């Protein structure tokens, strides 16, 4: 079992149950999935970009990546319907907890000029989204073998009913929030 999953079950869930005054352990908010998305506008001109992004994201997550395609043609962006424009991966269960553990303990401390995560990046339903400017903060990526620095979006989907519950959950996981 993943280290963070064990900590959640034994320490975080009982503490949150008391803190949020919930009657049942099943009511306690938990992280259900983590979605990583990499939008690749530059892939329009070069198909190699998609292959490199897929390889990077697969190294980071240890899971097969899905290529996303344009749903509509947009002349302003020079995009045609059906062209590959990004990659994404959804992590659940043990892989999700292992990724979250690596993100909090290894990757975020490697961010240059890191001052903490924005505590206002919740969506109103307890889900949290954050952006990473460079994929090289992950130890799985070899700096010498990357072709370009690419950012990615990380979304944590929780069972929290509102932002306050979601914030309490992520604070219990020791997320380094700014304010």
Curated annotation (Swiss-Prot):
NCBIfam families: PRK00010.1. GO terms for molecular function: rRNA binding; structural constituent of ribosome; tRNA binding. Part of the 50S ribosomal subunit; part of the 5S rRNA/L5/L18/L25 subcomplex. Contacts the 5S rRNA and the P site tRNA. Forms a bridge to the 30S subunit in the 70S ribosome. This is Large ribosomal subunit protein uL5. This is one of the proteins that bind and probably mediate the attachment of the 5S RNA into the large ribosomal subunit, where it forms part of the central protuberance. In the 70S ribosome it contacts protein S13 of the 30S subunit (bridge B1b), connecting the 2 subunits; this bridge is implicated in subunit movement. Contacts the P site tRNA; the 5S rRNA and some of its associated proteins might help stabilize positioning of ribosome-bound tRNAs. One of its GO terms (cellular component) is ribonucleoprotein complex. Disulfide bonds: none annotated. HAMAP family: Ribosomal_uL5_B. Belongs to the universal ribosomal protein uL5 family. Keywords: Ribonucleoprotein, Ribosomal protein, RNA-binding, rRNA-binding, tRNA-binding. InterPro entries: Ribosomal_uL5, Ribosomal_uL5_bac-type, Ribosomal_uL5_C, Ribosomal_uL5_CS, Ribosomal_uL5_dom_sf, Ribosomal_uL5_N. GO terms for biological process: translation.
């Amino acid at each position: 079992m993943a280290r963070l999953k064990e900590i959640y079950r034994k320490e975080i869930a009982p503490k949150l149950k008391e803190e949020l005054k919930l009657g049942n352990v099943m009511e306690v908010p938990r992280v259900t999935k983590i979605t990583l998305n990499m939008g690749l506008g530059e892939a329009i001109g070069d198909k190699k970009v998609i292959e490199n992004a897929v390889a990077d994201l697969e190294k980071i997550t240890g899971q097969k990546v899905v290529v996303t395609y344009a749903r509509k043609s947009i002349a302003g962006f020079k995009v045609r319907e059906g062209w590959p424009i990004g990659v994404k991966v959804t992590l659940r269960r043990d892989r999700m907890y292992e990724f979250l553990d690596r993100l909090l303990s290894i990757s975020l401390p490697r961010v240059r000029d890191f001052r903490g995560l924005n505590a206002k990046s919740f969506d109103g339903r307890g889900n949290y989204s954050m952006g990473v400017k460079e994929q090289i903060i992950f130890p799985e990526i070899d700096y010498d073998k990357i072709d370009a620095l690419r950012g990615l979006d990380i979304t944590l989907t929780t069972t929290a009913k509102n932002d306050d519950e979601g914030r309490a959950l992520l604070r219990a996981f020791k997320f380094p929030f700014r304010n």
